[in-house]
């Protein structure tokens, strides 16, 4: 099944609008959690070639699914008494229901940018960013004996006592 081509800006706009309406009734921790992840989404829009930006946005969306379940289950009974409370809670629930679909779309964008699902032991290892620079820890003969070139040029070589 082919996923529809949805712009990341549309995903951000929908979740921003639903989060804003959800903030009418839920605590500030709901707002901080969701708006922080939306800021990561803005970073992913600004840097179109960054795998880390879209990966962090994807991970944040997954995390907010669990956080929103906790927020809604704890505070729903106390806030859904009036019309405004039911509206805000409904928008937060709608945002929660759309997040798994958004995660699928963002994961598809992550794969298009060259990312892969980090299910390896070196998950917290080096970044997957592609650049023209060589790594410092590349193996070469100069790394094995750093003072070999100094002896050949007649320069003073530091000696251990």
Curated annotation (Swiss-Prot):
Tissue specificity of this protein: Ubiquitous but more abundant in kidney, testis and heart.
Cytoplasmic side: 48-53, 108-161
Domain of life: Eukaryota
SMART domains assigned to the protein according to its UniProt record, in alphabetical order: AGTRAP
Protein's cellular compartments: Endoplasmic reticulum membrane; Golgi apparatus membrane; Cytoplasmic vesicle membrane
Stretch forming the signal peptide: none
Record's keyword annotation contains Membrane: yes
InterPro entries xref list: AGTRAP (IPR009436)
PANTHER family linked: TYPE-1 ANGIOTENSIN II RECEPTOR-ASSOCIATED PROTEIN (PTHR16521:SF3)
Protein name: Type-1 angiotensin II receptor-associated protein
Gene: Agtrap
């Amino acid at each position: 099944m082919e996923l529809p081509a949805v712009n990341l800006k549309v995903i951000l706009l929908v979740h921003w609008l639903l989060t804003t309406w959800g903030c009418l009734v839920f605590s500030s921790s709901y707002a901080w959690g969701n708006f922080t992840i939306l800021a990561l989404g803005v970073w992913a829009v600004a840097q179109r070639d960054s795998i880390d930006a879209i990966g962090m946005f994807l991970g944040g969306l997954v995390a907010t699914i669990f956080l929103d379940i906790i927020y809604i289950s704890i505070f729903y009974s106390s806030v859904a008494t009036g019309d405004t409370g039911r509206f805000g809670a409904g928008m937060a629930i709608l945002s929660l229901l759309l997040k798994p679909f958004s995660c699928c779309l963002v994961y598809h964008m992550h794969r298009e940018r060259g990312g892969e699902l980090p299910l390896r032991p070196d998950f917290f290892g080096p970044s997957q960013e592609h650049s023209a620079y060589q790594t410092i820890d590349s193996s070469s003969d100069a790394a094995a004996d750093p003072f070999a070139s100094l002896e050949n040029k007649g320069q003073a070589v530091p000696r251990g006592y």
